[in-house]
Design a protein with these regions (language model features):
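N-terminal targeting signals for export/organelle localization
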Residues: 1-50, 177
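A short beta-strand-turn-helix
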Residues: 52-73
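Conserved redox-active cysteine motifs that mediate thiol-disulfide chemistry
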Residues: 69-70, 77-94
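Hydrophobic beta-strand anchors of alpha/beta hydrolase catalytic cores
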Residues: 74-75, 103, 148
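Structural microenvironment flanking redox-active thiols in thiol-disulfide oxidoreductases
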Residues: 86-124, 132-139
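Thiol/disulfide oxidoreductase modules built on the thioredoxin-like
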Residues: 122-126, 132-176
Length: 177
């Protein structure tokens, strides 16, 4: 093989190696990109987008989950008669001191009217929005309370669980960033 042929073979090998490296880098980048939020399906479990359920505020005005886009949202499904829910409220009071978190509590028991719930909210020192919706409980398949959802700024559920400690909340929220 003459010198010119060796140069062409070496040049072809270098071009092929560089092309492969560029392609593999592009492929790796595609696999590590976070998916477009719009492509994430709606659902009620971790990893899905919150369905935009309308719940009724104590003032009678509608509240939508999408009202909280751009903020980390903690959704607390609860009822006034539920002792663990009252304990969860104590944790949520501490959590409400964070400026990067919004909290929305949803009463799931239709037996309680807005007058009672307003008094309950004030007695429990809840400074966030308390709403009432048995339909939302059905939509989100609430089988026990307190049920807690934490959604990121794009409305994607990052945590679903029951009674949640302040330490656990802080860890979840810090992971969301």
């Amino acid at each position: 093989m003459d010198g010119a042929a060796k140069k062409y073979i070496m040049l072809a090998f270098i071009v092929l190696t560089l092309s492969s490296a560029v392609y593999l880098g592009w492929l790796n980048d595609q696999n590590t990109q976070t998916p477009d939020t719009e492509s994430i399906p709606f659902g009620v479990e971790k990893g899905y987008r919150l369905r935009d359920v309308e719940v009724t505020g104590l003032d009678g005005k509608p509240v939508l989950f999408s009202d909280y886009r751009g903020s980390i949202l903690v959704v607390d499904f609860m009822a006034p008669w539920c002792s663990p829910c009252k304990e969860q409220i104590k944790v949520l009071i501490q959590l409400s001191q964070r400026t990067d978190v919004e909290i929305l509590s949803i009463n799931v028991d239709p037996e309680y009217n807005s007058t009672y719930l307003t008094r309950f909210r004030d007695d429990e020192e809840m400074t966030w929005t308390l709403t009432s919706s048995a339909d939302a409980a059905v939509e989100y398949k609430v089988t026990a309370i307190p049920l807690i959802l934490v959604a990121d700024r794009d409305g994607v559920i990052r945590y679903k669980g029951y009674y949640t400690t302040l330490t656990n909340f802080q860890q979840i929220i810090d992971e969301i960033g």
